[in-house]
Amino acid sequence: TMFNVETRISEKCIGCYPRVEGSDPESGGLPMETRCMAACIGQVRMQGTVKLNEDGTWAEDRYNPLYYMIHVAKVALPLYPQFGTEPNGYYIPPRWVPRAYLRQMFGPGVDAAVEKYMYPDRELLAVLQLFRRSNRIIYRYELKEGPKVYEGTLRGKPFEMYNDTVIAYGADGKEMFRTEIEEPLFVRPDIHQNSI
């Protein structure tokens, strides 16, 4: 809940239902992320929906970014899984927090999740590029392989990076955007004070 100082009433978050349902005027009829997700300056949040089986368990949806991070790559974990709280909020555990504390917060899978996140494979690195590229909910992604752009070591382990393209699709099945792994480099001309 949030305290509204003008009305002097505590107001509960409604989860931005008009946005999530696609009835927000800005949405064009397509589901959008909540305002708090869209306003996240750290580009560390992703909101989405998953397909469910009749018994309420997650249906396999291999190319849904949430399903991939939670059930395939297993880098996104529930916070305090022993409580079984709802709704399902999943987090990629931070790698700089002491592991004993992370094990308490995320359970026994945290060590493998942190290792996988620190040394991402080709697909995980591509899926991580989807974060905060759009305020619309991503329902599916596609990976188009590109050339190798880096080969070396990362924290003492061999690492290869490819300039793959990841394509995001919305609820209507249409392409929302595409982005590459390797970010372009721009050099400002000397006429600007802060040029290099």
Segments predicted by a language model, with ranges:
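Ferredoxin-like iron-sulfur electron-transfer modules
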Residues: 1-34, 38, 50-53, 57
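Long, compositionally biased charged/polar accessory segments in the mid-to-C-terminal portions
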Residues: 37, 41-196
